[in-house]
Each structure stands twice: as C-alpha cells, then as structure tokens.
A protein has these predicted regions:
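Conserved SAM-binding motif I beta-strand of class I
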Residues: 15-16
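N-terminal Rossmann-like NAD(P) cofactor-binding module of classical short-chain dehydrogenase/reductase
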Residues: 46-55, 75-77
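Conserved Rossmann-fold cofactor-binding substructure of NAD(P)-dependent oxidoreductases
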Residues: 36-51, 60
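Beta-loop-alpha module in the N-terminal Rossmann-like domain of NAD(P)-dependent dehydrogenases
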Residues: 51-67, 81-84
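C-terminal catalytic/substrate-binding lobe primarily of soluble NAD(P)-dependent oxidoreductases
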Residues: 119-354
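Helix N-cap at the beta1-alpha1 junction of Rossmann-like dinucleotide-binding domains, i.e.
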Residues: 19-22, 82
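Rossmann-fold NAD(P)-binding glycine/threonine-rich loop
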Residues: 78-101
Length: 354
C-alpha cells in the first residue's frame, strides 16, 4: 500500500493482489484481484503497463520475476527468495529488460550505499546490522512480523554466508550472537543471517563482508529451541493420518501472534560500517538509520517501500537503463537521488566519517 500510494502521486498505478481485503484498504488506486502465481494471468495483466513493481512472498518471488521478464516488462522487485537472481540475467538481456532486484532496506539501500563508496574508495571491510522491531517489547516473542511469516522463518533456517579474508564462510543462521548498543534504543542482539546475497559475487574484491540481523536480547534462544525441535522443518510429518509440513503449522500459529495490531508501532534500525582507503588515507564511514512508525505507516514498509519506489522512478523515467539483472549495488551512482528521495519522505540516514 505504501509503495502504491507513493507512486500514484506521479504515475498511473494499478495494484494487484490475491486478497480483496488487502486491496480494499487502497483508496483512490486502481485495483485488480488476481493470482499472480499463475503465469498466464500475470502476463496478461501486465501487457499494457510500463513497469512492474514486485512485492510477493519469497516462495513465489523468483518465478514471478521470471514470468515478468519473459513478457518483456521492466521490473523493480523487493521479494526475497533463495534462488540466485543472476540465473535470470541471460533471459533479461535477451528480452531487453531492466530488472532491479532486492530493492528494500537491506538488501537494498545498504547495497546502494556500498556501491556508492566502492566507486570512490578501496573498501576492505563492510558490516551491515539491520532489524525491524516493535516499539513495545512484549513477552514471549518480543517481535512482530511485517513480512510474510514463512519468509521470516526462512531467515532463521537459511545458512548464513559471509566473507572473511576473501574466503566465503557459511555458518548456521542465528549463530555468533553479539550484544550491541544503539542510541535511543539501548542494547540489541545481532546474529548471522544470509543478507549479503548478490554482494558475495559483485563485491568479490572486498575481503571482509558480513550482514547480521538485530533482535531484542534473548529472542535468539527461543528461536533456536523451536528450530532444534523441528518446528521450522519443511519435511512432512504424519499427524493423525494427515501429512503436514511443520513450518506451515508454525507459520499458521505464529502469524496471528506476530501480526501488528491497530495501535502497534515499530521501528527500523540499521548500522553500516565500511572501512578502507580513500585518497591514500585510512577512513571509515558509518551510516545510521533509526526510523519510527509515522503517519499510520509501518516503519519497515516506509524504509523498504520508499527505496523501491525511488528506484522504480529511476527506471520508469529512463534514468537507469542497464539491461539485465541489477542488484542494488549497481545503482551506487544514483545514491544521492535515492537518499534525497527517502529524506523527503522522512527516512533519514546519518553518516559519520572518521
């Protein structure tokens, strides 16, 4: 909804969703209730549009992107899927399609910042810490999900890849917890998550890179218990003669508990630290984001959504024209535009240079 409303200020926007209930919340925007997991439905729908903005659950993200590219339409996407997006690069080039992936906050804005500095300095270290949390810390979960619950659970089981001394290291998710202090928030806990994604390939010249997720301290313990007990497993088990995947049951049970209710507020926190040499001198840059629920809009929707709409504007206005799959770091040259676009909408990144 945030993205549709923002884009509708300057463009003719149509929102498509499988849920009529979701569409009913959008005032003054054209809506179509349809199932975009069906290729034919999707490709017929997008025939007369200049740009597709994708925001679907991860399990259907890759296929949706492929279907859009096959139809020859430009796409800017924030869906987080486990498949390698570069698998669609050849197809996108054949079809002459501009396809920008992972256009959220991290991956997303973090990559744009990285790409911007990579063109100006020799980076040796990149660290990104990021989390979206409820302002009110409540037992037992101390967490609320603004994404599809199965995507959140996926983060807790997908092995985390990071780069140390130019070697890729894989560890299990939720490992290497650290307590970290943040102004205005206090102590949060970080742990390894698989957020580097495309950077492992595109920034292979940077010897040290890591991305970690932030939660309230102690949250990791119960997640590890649930994981070790099999609640996040995709392998079917038989219960009273019915075969079910434990992860589906867990998502079903947790979603109402994790869902943000009316009156709930969230915040997004991100800290990026880059170290290296610039003009022959050792430097470090630290970017800090603390964004809070504002104007009845979820912070995570603002921080991810406005990054995506900034890039959508660049593509639809012909200012970003690189054909093929583009991870956000390729848009480093448009950093100032995206940063200003976010600032105009109240999402402010503060930078400290040392």
């Amino acid at each position: 909804g945030v993205m549709a409303k923002d884009l509708a200020k300057q463009h003719n926007v149509t929102s498509v969703d499988i849920s009529q209930k979701n569409l009913d919340k959008l005032e003054g925007i054209n809506t179509i209730c349809a199932d975009v997991s069906n290729r034919e439905t999707l490709q017929n729908l997008i025939k007369y549009f200049d740009l597709v903005v994708g925001a679907v659950p991860g399990f259907m993200g890759y296929k949706m992107m492929k279907d859009v590219i096959e139809a020859g339409k430009n796409i800017v996407d924030i869906s987080f899927y486990s498949e390698d997006p570069f698998g669609l690069d050849k197809l996108a080039k054949e079809k002459g399609v501009v396809a920008v992936m992972d256009c959220g906050v991290a991956p997303g804005m973090g990559n744009i910042i990285f790409g911007h500095h990579d063109s100006k300095m020799e980076i040796t270290d990149y660290e990104c810490l990021v989390g979206g949390l409820p302002e009110k810390r409540e037992w037992p979960y101390e967490y609320q999900a603004v994404f599809s619950p199965i995507d959140v659970i996926e983060e807790y089981i997908r092995p985390a890849r990071y780069v140390q001394n130019s070697h890729m290291i894989t560890k299990e998710a939720l490992s290497d917890t650290e307590l970290i202090e943040f102004d205005e928030i206090g102590t949060l806990e970080s742990w390894n998550s698989d957020g580097l994604r495309s950077l492992i390939k595109t920034m292979a010249h940077v010897p040290n890179m890591i991305e970690k997720t932030l939660r309230y301290p102690g949250c990791v313990e119960y997640l590890k218990v649930l994981r070790a007990s099999g609640f996040f497993s995709y392998d079917e088990v038989e219960v009273n003669g019915t075969m079910i995947r434990p992860v589906d049951m867990t998502a079903k049970l947790l979603f109402p508990k994790w869902e943000m209710k009316k009156g709930d507020k969230d915040f997004t926190v991100m800290r990026i630290i880059m170290k290296g040499k610039e003009n022959g001198k050792e430097v470090s840059y630290q970017y800090n984001l603390l964004d809070r629920f504002d104007n009845d809009t979820i912070s995570m929707a603002r921080t991810t959504g406005f990054t995506c709409t900034a890039v959508a504007n660049l593509v639809v206005n012909g200012e970003y024209e690189r054909v093929g799959i583009s991870p956000p770091e390729y848009l480093g040259g448009h950093f100032e535009f995206v940063k200003n676009y976010l600032e105009e909408r109240g999402v402010k990144y503060k930078v400290i240079k040392k």
